UniProtKB/Swiss-Prot annotation:
Protein's UniProt name: Uncharacterized protein sll0103
Pfam families per record: VWA (PF00092)
CDD domains, sorted: vWA_subgroup (cd01465)
PANTHER family for this protein: CALCIUM-ACTIVATED CHLORIDE CHANNEL REGULATOR, ZINC FINGER (C3HC4-TYPE RING FINGER) FAMILY PROTEIN
Region (Disordered): 389-420
Signal peptide: none
Gene3D superfamilies found in the cross-reference section: von Willebrand factor, type A domain
Length: 420
């Protein structure tokens, strides 16, 4: 398994007469499988809400979806299951999947009762998942349908960081319309995972399978971007680095002396992690300049090796006295993706502050950006919600969650999930 890394600037040329210039840097990184590479062993922890509001079809559907995932695990994989209401309990201790019948019975016995304390479930999930993480792809699927009424949201966010420190990826799944998208998104972002919205119980199985497929396609783990810039190049001070694919989120930069470091988490073999960096460049003399270099530090569970380094990849730019722009289409697409996310964030902030007209205007702007990207489904949702606000209607909880989801991803038309 190897690193596949590419760098693209928004404009490869620079005006020699400009005192300062701004450029966006697109970094794409993935794991590149060799012919003999096999799927890595998995360490899956399910953290499931079984509070009273999950009674009936919601809990039965989630149990069915969980059992469907377990059927896909192999004997060398490890599984743990945590259930939480206002307390948390271990349903399945971290173990290899060798007694499917006993595991299924334990999950089937879950009943809906009690309140909701997400942080208690996540804490216990981290403890169990950590027991089986050695040389495995370790993911936590955290599902809830409610607000953290008996828990502490700040503690949830700290636990997301703890999971990341333990090299655990956390995917959060919001079930129905009454969960807190700010909290679940922040947990997922801090642990390099994704946020999913299960609007209807019938979507649970498909969503679980999508996440399981993503987990199965991980080739390398615990990846970090290492960026070393020349003295004439600087990262933006505010929000300098964002991920724009597979989903959009802001990433945290840690300064390590001359190196800027960003944790990426898992690297997949079937899709790239794409980052967009905001750079500022001082005036440079005409000619070609190396303005930085990029490396990836990562772990390879297949070989048991950690802290491996990819070959350094130089970042170059051409400085011209007769400046001619040379823009890159792929970088422009990434810029639009991030713009849609930022515009929707501004709209949500305005709506919370009571500025309905301002929110509607920003949603319309985001809808136009989505259309430029070819994201017709996202544009429709954003424009529909803008129109509702303009006509004096309130956005439902479902509307707000759809808005959040389309800001982070490009929605695909629904398709029937495979049974195999």
């Amino acid at each position: 398994m190897r690193i596949d890394l590419s760098l693209l600037l928004s404009d490869q040329n620079l005006d020699a007469g400009a005192p300062t210039s701004q450029r966006q840097l697109r970094i794409a990184v993935a794991a590149k499988a060799d012919d003999h590479d096999r799927r890595l062993p998995l360490n899956l922890c399910l953290v499931l809400d079984h509070s009273g509001s999950m009674d009936g079809q919601p809990l039965e559907t989630v149990k069915s979806a969980a059992l469907g995932l377990i059927d896909r695990l192999e004997e060398d994989d490890r599984l743990s299951v945590i259930a939480f209401d206002h307390r948390a309990k271990i349903v399945i201790e971290n173990q290899q999947v060798r007694n499917g019948a006993a595991i299924a019975k334990a999950i089937e016995r879950l009943k809906a009762e009690g309140g909701t304390a997400i942080d208690e479930g996540l804490k216990l999930g981290i403890q169990e998942a950590a027991k089986g993480k050695e040389d495995r792809v370790s993911h936590i699927f955290l599902l809830t349908d409610g607000e953290n009424e008996h828990g502490d949201n700040d503690r949830c966010l700290k636990l997301g960081t703890v999971a990341s420190d333990y090299k655990l990826t956390v995917h959060t799944l919001g079930f129905g319309d009454h969960w807190n998208q700010d909290v679940l998104e922040a947990i997922a972002a801090s642990a390099q995972g994704s946020l999913s919205y299960i609007e209807n119980p019938s979507e649970a199985l498909h969503t679980f399978r999508q996440l399981f497929q993503r987990m199965s396609n991980v080739g390398l783990t615990n990846a970090h971007l290492l960026l070393e810039l020349a003295p004439q190049a600087h990262l933006a001070i505010v929000k300098p680095v964002a991920q724009v694919s597979p989903e959009t989120m802001d990433l945290t930069v840690q300064n390590q002396g001359a190196i800027e470091e960003v944790r990426l988490g898992d690297l997949m073999t079937d899709q790239e992690r794409v980052l967009l960096l905001n750079l500022y460049l001082d005036q440079l003399l005409p000619g070609q300049h190396v303005i930085g270099q990029v490396q990836i530090r990562y772990d390879d569970p297949a070989s048991g090796q950690t802290n491996l380094l990819s070959d350094p990849l130089p970042l170059t730019i051409q400085v011209q006295t007769q400046y001619q722009p040379s823009t890159d289409v792929q970088v422009q697409e990434s810029i639009l993706t991030l713009a849609k996310y930022r515009q929707t964030q501004i709209a949500e902030t305005k709506l919370k502050a009571g500025d309905r007209q301002g929110a509607a205007t920003m949603l319309q702007t985001a809808a136009k950006t989505a259309l430029q990207m070819g994201d017709k489904n996202g544009a429709t949702i954003l424009q529909t919600n803008a129109t509702r606000l303009q006509s004096g209607e309130d956005l439902s909880e479902g509307d707000r969650k759809k808005t959040r989801m389309v800001s982070k991803t490009t929605l695909q038309p629904p398709s029937a999930p495979s049974e195999h």
